[in-house]
């Protein structure tokens, strides 16, 4: 079979890969993209999108139980887990099909199969129909990541699940253990707990959502406990003993080892990059444990080879991958894109209440030597939040006292994942406290709390 030549080959069609392919095509490049599973990658098929569909079902279920608060009468509230999962899978299927349409629209050649790199500038694709040989001056690695599995805690799909199993559960857990309280673990804990599972969350660090500001973590823990979750911090899972229909987890904390019985365990202890079976060692690509080492422009050090998204390391966020994809495509086409500033990438967790943040935590800002001005504003002081029946939460802003630079923003409460982008834009534009204070926020909106938090940092809050 004849070798096919392209300007750019993208390996992996997740949010980093397919966006890179689109942008490269827009810039006049002849582009191919290779995907071994489904267009859209983990995010669209097994991560960001289907989990949000599940969580939306849980949110509606929760609101139906609160109907009386809103002057409504509802009886016979129940859920059909199979139908909930079917809706989630349908959403993923719809969007995956949309990616296929985008590839056709932008004249990107799609190869469904597994890729390897036998030499610089060359890619071999094993498809159902045979082997394809491709060449390109520029190759973008966007192969994503998968769930990390620790020895003794490996998933079996029956009693012990990864996120993939949790996204299409064959049964509703009655007594659930979630190992890890990062975004993935907490979102699944929130989903199953809302539907009625007796849920325990184990976290090895000293607090849940450990990457968040300490005040947000503390507030989240109280909210989760109020919802019926058990939160065990500074605790490790030493061993899982499995038998018919149950798992005995041996948990260790400062007091010693205790044993607890569950019918389901979800392991959410991080992810590892898909770096295997690509031939990276042959090319001399530098690997740091589970990810490819890159510079600020996602260059691997091998001429013409780039790595974006989860395979290139933290933060493991789809929007970071997409932005890197655009940046690399523009670089390949001869442009001069700006490198991404990691501190200006927002993180969002879609538990109840939602959590969102950007920039430094208060502790990190102090460690960096800044003199701070810190503002806080509670949801209970916002009219829209009260009208929505969502008066729990707060917004915290952190400023450099000397320059007025917004160093960080941290939120917990209803719809904060939609609010955080305001502060992201502020950081990108290098706005100061004066710019934010003089901005008119619409009323009545939740966004008014963003303004009030800034005002509070400078002793000017109006509604507390």
Segment roles from a protein language model:
Residues 9-11, 115, 133-144, 178-179, ...:
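Short hydrophobic core segments
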Residues 9-16, 25-37, 42, 49, ...:
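Flexible, glycine-rich terminal cap/loop adjacent to redox cofactors
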Residues 2-6, 22-29, 34-172, 200, ...:
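Glycine-rich flavin
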Residues 50, 123, 273, 300, ...:
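Hydrophobic "anchor" residues
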Residues 2-14, 172-179:
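Beta1/beta-strand and adjacent pyrophosphate-binding region of the FAD-binding site
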Residues 48, 143-198, 202, 281-283, ...:
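Glycine-rich dinucleotide-binding loop and its adjacent helix/turn
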Residues 15-20, 42, 160, 184-188, ...:
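Short glycine/serine/threonine-rich phosphate/pyrophosphate-binding segments
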Residues 156-172, 259-334:
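FAD-site-proximal beta/loop scaffold in flavoenzymes
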